[in-house]
């Protein structure tokens, strides 16, 4: 069975629910009122897709401003970035843009980026609490991200949409690896097919003393 390692980093403002999001996915638990992350926390999850074992390293970074300078340490070499905002907080959506700019500045241009709006359970109970329409997230992604980037809305509390986020990301990671391997294979074949042509004159010159 083949295997693949992938590093995923979660970024976003303090209090948007990144830790609850990760805890729900990794441990299938919801813990309300979790303490704010200090620096970053690290989780592992192993997923089998077809004949490939995908070993995920999920980094949950702190959203407080005082830890922002430490963020590049944690998202270095990441394969995917998940930008999180709270659908009931316009400020958290606006702050997300700073994290996006950091990712674009410090990581390769082909990094997979997804945007996740959290706490949709709150707006189901009280629609007037919503400050960020889903359509606005889609519009933002089409303007700033690659065409295959995705927007999601989830509820860690109700376990809604959490699994689907990572399923889509894993599929993209596997597709990207396959494309990279195919490109590498094609490049090797091209190098092997190159024939150096020379004339008799070249041969005579090369043998002159």
Curated annotation (Swiss-Prot):
Q: Name one GO cellular component term.
A: plasma membrane
Record-level Gene Ontology MF annotations: GTP binding; GTPase activity
Instruction: Name any Gene Ontology BP term.
Output: intracellular protein transport
Q: What is this protein called?
A: Ras-like GTP-binding protein RYL2
Presence of keyword Membrane: yes
For membrane topology, the record states:
Lipid-anchor
InterPro entries reported in the protein's UniProt record: P-loop_NTPase (IPR027417), Small_GTP-bd (IPR005225), Small_GTPase (IPR001806)
Keywords carried by this UniProt record: Cell membrane, GTP-binding, Lipoprotein, Membrane, Nucleotide-binding, Prenylation, Protein transport, Transport
PROSITE patterns linked to this entry = RAB (PS51419)
Query: What subcellular compartments does it reside in?
Result: Cell membrane
Q: Which domain of life is it from?
A: Eukaryota
**Similarity section:** Belongs to the small GTPase superfamily. Rab family.
The free-text function statement in the UniProt record for this protein reads: Protein transport. Probably involved in vesicular traffic.
**What residues bind GTP, as annotated?**
12-19, 60-64, 118-121
Motif Effector region: chain residues: 34-42
What residues show lipidation of type S-geranylgeranyl cysteine? Answer: 208-209
